[in-house]
Each structure stands twice: as structure tokens, then as C-alpha cells.
Amino acid sequence: MEWLYNLFLEHSALQAVVVLSLISAIGLGLGRVHFWGVSLGVTFVFFAGILAGHFGLSVDPQMLNYAESFGLVIFVYSLGLQVGPGFFSSFRKGGVTLNMLALAVVLLGTLLTVVASYATGVSLPDMVGILCGATTNTPALGAAQQTLKQMGIESSTPALGCAVAYPMGVIGVILAVLLIRKFLVHKEDLEIKEKDDANKTFIAAFQVHNPAIFNKSIKDIAQMSYPKFVISRLWRDGHVSIPTSDKVLKEGDRLLVITAEKNVLALTVLFGEQEENTDWNKEDIDWNAIDSELISQRIVVTRPELNGKKLGSLRLRNHYGINISRVYRSGVQLLATPELILQLGDRLTVVGEAAAIQNVEKVLGNAVKSLKEPNLVVIFIGIVLGLALGAIPFSIPGISTPVKLGLAGGPIIVGILLGTFGPRIHMITYTTRSANLMLRALGLSMYLACLGLDAGAHFFDTVFRPEGLLWIALGAGLTIIPTVLVGFVAFKIMKIDFGSVSGMLCGSMANPMALNYANDTIPGDNPSVAYATVYPLCMFLRVIIAQVLLMFLLG
């Protein structure tokens, strides 16, 4: 039976892989079980790790540190890469508001930490450790321990406080989301609603009655007009055609125009009259039945050399006589303007004759199978850049110790930046949704298994000490009170959708486990987008605050 002992107990690379895989498998298996209608999902991996550590399982400390760090990096980088394309646009759609609400969660928790330390007599280093556990923020704990070492103060006690408060930190945010959902959220609030966005693409029909544009080309009219638009079809004398930019408009021409909804009124003035007898934005319109000579087909951009190119530079309309009416990217419908920068995976709705569309298909690629091949080069380059960013020390006035973004902050910021701007420098950042979810789940499982295993050895001894229950109660308060209060204000008073509120609360508490629960129980991507919108700022602030509290109150 020596082989069995070596497999599970003798420290080695093989033993570390076996133990962490076993913990992850048990935790993920339990995560499928629903208790009172609620499943904690991947969070059970953390508790399986605590039990394994309590019963004596351990792995080599260096292997544990590597697996924990690598798992966290994979998770946050993949998350940033996924939400990157919509990250900066989210600031125009409430991102600033979400960050202000997340900031309120951070500051309220910090205030409660100071008050609780003075009210209960718990030392500030212990209280900072409890705060780090309550906010599931191990980078902040590392920063706090480093600060204590530089101040010549014992640095091990915050780790115990963090370990004791951490489980409640994981569950507390989920409980806060559950409480808000139970008492405030109605069934219709969980339905995916189309956002009221004036910039979304809109299809409208116009008839040319403005003498100012009679006998002028579409190109000249577009230069006269500030609102951007695309003329998809032109009806003249009973004949339907796809107009090129040189097409001259005449009185009485009927136009099918794609633009932003906010521009409809201005274009009505430009063309002369809007036809409102047909709703062209309904999803059940048979576009191919509108004109028998033309067909509509969706083509996917799969040729790598097109990544980062402007749509207008391809001159598809002039060369092939087709029209691109809409572009879909990551579930978002974009206006097909000449300035639009193409990304691998974009889905273009092309209208034209069958032969012309076949030619366009060759230009764009439309080889969907090629998109399933993972672009691992970008993954590893991004991880290196993210870790480099996280290692850069930032000097802040009044604080002697430089502050770093760390393992979590650097990679998610680089992931967001590459997801947003990568195609502009012809870097292929496209990853299928299933591949991205696999990376995130793998990274999070590794991270939680290591975290639980590390905390499990002394967890129950600390919990059952006289001050253990007090620490648990304080940690629960630091987790639940700020999230419930801010969540109530965000959802009930500010009328922010429940998915975004949940993601904001998870991001403000740096809690990927709660985010996983939110993603599993709330339709749509709003939780992930909101999480990534507030996570970088909150992570940075948590790391700074952990150091500032100790320096100013103990210095």
C-alpha cells in the first residue's frame, strides 16, 4: 500500500495534482446539489478544501502557492478578456454609477472595521485580517502582512482572522443577493430586457421629398448629414436595388435605412418623410421575401488578416454590389459604418444577389470551424503582461510602502484592455464562450481548492476559541451589512437591474464564487459585465486601504 501513501500523502508534484483534483471533483460534485432550492456551485470546492486540510491532507507549500496563484490569474484574465469588448461602453451605460456604488460598499466596510475594532477590543491587525476575509481579498491580506513586517509588528495574526472570516465572506455575498432577491425582486425583474439605448441600431423607412437632396449622390448626402446611416435598400419604379455610394436619389424614392434610434428624427428632416406603416425592427420579418432578386445571409468574419481592419476599407459594396445592414458582436448589434473596426467572430448580415454573396463569403471567411481553435498565444502573452503590471509598485503620497495591483488586479486590467483594443493592433483575442467558461471554471476551482486546503489545518481550532465566534460574527457583519444596504439602494431606489446589482456587489467584495452563483441563477451577462466594471477599482482600493488603516492608526 506504499503506492497509495505516496499518491495521497507523500509531498510531490504528482501528489499535489491528485489532491487538488480530488478536492475540486468532490467540491464540484457537491456544488450540483441544491439545498433549500439554492446551490453554491463551485464555492463548495473551497469548503471541500477546508475539510481536507482539517483531516491532515496537505501538499508542498511551493506547489500550493503556484497552483493558487496560477488558478487566480487564469480566472481573472479570462474574465477580463470576455467582458473587455463591452467594458468601456458600459461606462456610458451606467458604469460610473456602478463604480460609485461599489466605492460605497468599500468605504462602508472600512468604516465598520474601524468602529468594530474600538467597540469590541479586537486589535486592528486582527480586524484588518477579518476585513480581508470578509471581502475574500487575499491580495489585500498579503499587503497588510507586508506592512506589519515593515512596522516591526507580528504579521501572522491577520491570516487567522482572514481564514475564519473567509467562509462567511464567500457565503455572505450570496446571502445578500438571496435576501435582495427574496424580498425585493419579482419574477419579471429576472427577465432579460432590451436596454433603452438611444445608440442601438434601428431600421426605418423613408421617402425622399426634400428638394435639397434631389439628384444628389448618397455619398454627398452622407457628407452633408451629421447622423451616420446606411441605406440598405432603395425602391424606385417598383424595382428594389442595393444602392452604392454613387447612387443618385430622386424624388419619391423609398429608402430602407439603418441608423441609431436617436437619429431617426434628424433623418426624417433630411429625407423628407418617414413611413411608419411597417415595423422593420421586428425579429420575424422575412427579409428574403421583401425582394425576390435579393437574399439576406449572415456571414462570419474568420480570416485573421481582417482582424482590426475598417469595414469601409474592404469596399464590399462597390466591388460586389452588396450591402451590409447589421453587425453582431458578443450579442450586441452594431451599425455597419465604414469606420467600424472588424473583429474576428463578427457576424455580418449581408444583402445582395446570391452570386455576389458567395464572393463576399470568400472574402470574409465564414469558416466557423476555424473559430473553435483556441488562440493560446494571446492567453499567455496577456498573462505575462498582466503579472508585469501587477508587480509594478505605485507610490502614494503619505504611504511609505509602495502599493501593487498584484496577481488579481494586473491580469484583469490587461484582459479588459486586450479584449477591447487587441483587434485594433491586429491581435486575435477571440475565444469561444465555451472555451472562456472552461478556463474560468478551471482557474477558479484550482484557486479555491488551494485556498481551502491552506486554511483548513487551523480553521476549526481558531473557530472554537473564545474569540472565534466573535470574529465570525464581525466578518459576517462586514460582508452582509454593506452589501445589503448598497444593494437595496441600487435596486429599489436607483432602479438598476438585478443582474448588474448582483455583479456590482460581487465585484465590490472581490468575490468570484458569488459571481459564479449569480451567473448560474440570473439570465444574461449583466452580472459578469458589472463585476468586471467595478472589480479593478475595488481591488486597487482594498489593497490600499488594508495598508492605510495599519499605517495611519498604528503608526
UniProtKB/Swiss-Prot annotation:
GO terms for molecular function: monoatomic cation transmembrane transporter activity. Keywords: Cell membrane, Membrane, Repeat, Transmembrane, Transmembrane helix, Transport. GO terms for cellular component: plasma membrane. It comes from the Bacteria. Residues 188-273, 282-366 form the RCK C-terminal domain. It holds the Pfam family TrkA_C. It is a multi-pass membrane protein. Coiled coil: none annotated. The keyword RNA-binding does not apply. One of its GO terms (biological process) is potassium ion transport. The keyword Nucleus does not apply. It is found in: Cell membrane. The chain crosses the membrane at residues 13-30, 35-57, 72-91, 98-120, 157-179, 376-398, 408-430, 437-459, 469-491, 498-517, 532-554. Belongs to the AAE transporter (TC 2.A.81) family. This is Uncharacterized transporter BT_1229.
